[in-house]
Amino acid sequence: MKYIVVTGGVMSGLGKGITIASIGRNLKNKGYKVTAIKIDPYINIDAGTMSPYQHGEVFVLRDGGEVDLDLGNYERFLDTELTRDHNITTGKVYQEVIAKERRGDYLGKTVQIIPHITNEIKNKIRKVAARSGADVCLIEIGGTVGDIESMPFLEAVRQMHREEPSENIVFIHVTLVMEDLQGEQKTKPTQHSVKELRALGLSPEVIVTRSKTPLQESAKEKIALFCDVPQELVISAHDAGDIYEVPLEIEEQGLTTQLMKHLRLESGVDDGGWREMVARMKSTTDEVKLAIVGKYTNLEDSYLSILEAVKHGGIDNACRVEVNMVEAETLEEDLVEVEKLKQYDGILIPGGFGGRGTEGKMLAIKFARENDIPFLGICLGMQLAVIEFARNVANLENANSTEFDEDTPYPVIDILPEQTGVADMGGTMRLGDYDAILKEGSFATKLYGTNYIVERHRHRYEVNPEFVDRLESFGIVFSGKNKNRMEIAEIPGKRFFFASQFHPEFKSRPGRPSPPFKGLVRAMCKYRKEREVQ
């Protein structure tokens, strides 16, 4: 097994995840099987109970793992499926070590950070890498060098560097290069960051610099000199027009070739597929506008996978999608804001929790339904579409979800039976892959091209089966089901009115878009052309 370990310095949020994903993509383009592990030094077991304002969206894996959004980037770039074990947290490590201590696995010994915690970290890394069957395992250590939380993980990979043959492991350090008022790039923070890393016994073979503009030759020379790395291994990861251009950006600087040389991997022929996809993305001329009506609109990372899936749909339809975030509560406060939705070619209601903003979202759904604007609802978006339909079409006044109103006379959305009495919040929802059978001749079947699908889920509430027949008698169709669970709702005769209990965005890939997003953008393009003719 070959390991590529990526650390970060100067500050967090530099883009280590995109760096890892881009390196992995380039190695995959050369014919190698690649997997990736994200190490998060927080004490949480997983990301499931974190606010989107803390870490952005919670990405859901096929096995139900609720993880950091970086793993979503890994899956999209590498076109692979990961598991919950690919996300190692301090919480998981300590939980396992304490469980072993209680079982008596360390009987007679004092349990310590070294060797017990560090050994557990190494064991987790090696087990995941081995099970994946990959040629190369990429490891991202979250946070910044110098953070107290990261120390056990840095010590663990230091030990791995000592234990593995030198041709089996390489260290990459990602740092920030800032510019002063005169535009000169300053390398001191990078130098100090590498110095701090070396004090921990780690010497990076490659330095990747994040900057607004391409790294100047003088700055590259200075970093190479003071950080003791060859100049050709100081890589500029400057801001790109789109994250999917980053693999090409670092490939052109020879990083993949240098890594393969260090790891003694035979050079393969690039199939060119990624480059072609990026070229298609950049050559789009048509443009449509999409409104995402949500409650976490101040932080776009809250809806990262949705934004990427929309982009994938745009690439496939040779159309650029301009996305505007609309705060749901503003629609509740001023109906004039609702009318402004007519400027959009499509409306999307994403998933979420809690009652804040739900009435505003339903106003947006009603506007889309009545004005036949292409609409996509996801998870909570589907539940609200059903509530809106129940109230305004099926004459079920004050219909609601028991999540928001336990005393509603028409609980068209109710808690999952197995969730009743569940007290713990973490990892207890209906999570991960579940299948659905699609109704023959439905729009959903046409969209997917099959009557059997598997998609990822994250929810506690569902459409109440007691109201399905009554709602369908008024025209809505539940065209996808998992046994007696409603997975898809659609309204026939509309340009595009599709809502899913599952999260299709989590399985969307560049070059292979999720069918609902591909269909939404296609409908938006058609709607835009119809409006232009009028």
Curated annotation (Swiss-Prot):
EC number: 6.3.4.2
Residues that coordinate or bind UTP: S12, K186, T187, K188, P189, T190, Q191, K222
A biological process from GO: pyrimidine nucleobase biosynthetic process
Residue ranges annotated for the Glutamine amidotransferase type-1 domain, each copy included: 289-530
GO molecular function annotations of the record: ATP binding; CTP synthase activity; glutaminase activity; identical protein binding; metal ion binding
Assigned protein family: Belongs to the CTP synthase family.
Additional remarks: CTPSs have evolved a hybrid strategy for distinguishing between UTP and CTP. The overlapping regions of the product feedback inhibitory and substrate sites recognize a common feature in both compounds, the triphosphate moiety. To differentiate isosteric substrate and product pyrimidine rings, an additional pocket far from the expected kinase/ligase catalytic site, specifically recognizes the cytosine and ribose portions of the product inhibitor.
Record-linked PANTHER family: CTP SYNTHASE (PTHR11550), CTP SYNTHASE-RELATED (PTHR11550:SF0)
Entry protein name: CTP synthase
Species for this entry: Methanosarcina mazei (strain ATCC BAA-159 / DSM 3647 / Goe1 / Go1 / JCM 11833 / OCM 88)
Gene field: pyrG
